[in-house]
Amino acid sequence: MTKFTPLAMTKRLVAFDTTSRGSNLDLIEFATSYLQDLGIDATLIHNAEKTKANLFATIGPTDVPGVVLSGHTDVVPVDGQDWTTAPFDPVRSGSRLFGRGTSDMKSFIATALALAPDMIAADLKMPIHFAFSYDEEVGCLGVHGIISHLSKISPLPRAVIVGEPTDMKVVNAHKGVFAYRTSVLGFEAHSSATHVGVNAVMYAAQLVSYLSELAADQRDYHGKHHRFEPPYTTVHVGTIQGGTALNIIPKECSFVWEYRLIPGENEDAILKKFSNYAEDVVLPKMKEVSEQTAIITERLGRVAPLVPEPDSPAETLAMMLAGTNRAEAVSYGTEGGIFQEAGVPTVVCGPGNILQAHRPNEYIEIAQINACEQFLRRLIEVAATQSV
């Protein structure tokens, strides 16, 4: 079989277009075949439509707690972005490798896969697990199947390392992400008859304005979490759609919004304030004109915050492997908080820089791939000599 370097494996994985709206099965089937050629059985956990799959595999003994190397296989779209190279035809230029997913986050998965032969040869006393998910970029949907699979493993892993891009710094805390869609249902009429219509767009604007007030409250009141940038919970409206024509009072308007929560804060507080304002202030004005009006808010996704666990097995191990005694905090979300909620100590540490994620001409410094390789080689040394 072909032996891959971490760089070569990264190029191979980036060549798969695994944009979240499509399938990741070509990549998963490649990884499964690669592992099978090494004598490693992989468990695939499919979505309901069988169009996507998670991969879970174990190298080493199955009767002692191990370390999970976790990564997502999907990437964000390239539509409308001005790329100077083909996004799924990775190109090396100087010290950088360009392509969608190079930083976020196929390099980590690739390095783990490339080192699988070395893990086998090391005769591990502590297992190393691969957990590669789908649909992280659209709400961490796939990882829940991996969590269900973990619940069947005895004993549970001792630690999870999520390889999102951190410049190989150890991250023990990140914000939670809570996403919603609010739909305002008004009453349609001719634009000259504003007294009989209920303008869904204008009432939606009031709700968006209130979210701006909540965002300002967070910024002004919460400024003590200096590990984060920015050091407070943020509120953001991403998209809004409504109306059909200038001379029609719009019947419908919807907007998608989120808040990114500092770990430890009440995750429902902002939603409750927003819901109370919608029900007690805005909706009564709408119903004065028509009882057919409504305001409906639905949750689109929840990414649990990663809560600091000083001296946890995951933090202790990752710091040793990275050669540091300092842990960082980040404002973006990962699957890490979900693993942590399932009872497994978790940190985030992987190659690449988050500032490159989701951008045109995404790239990773090849030095980062090399640093990840050394990090995982040290993990192999530890796993070959320690069982607890």
Short names for language-model regions:
Residues 105-179, 388:
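Acidic/histidine-rich catalytic neighborhood of metal-dependent amide-processing enzymes
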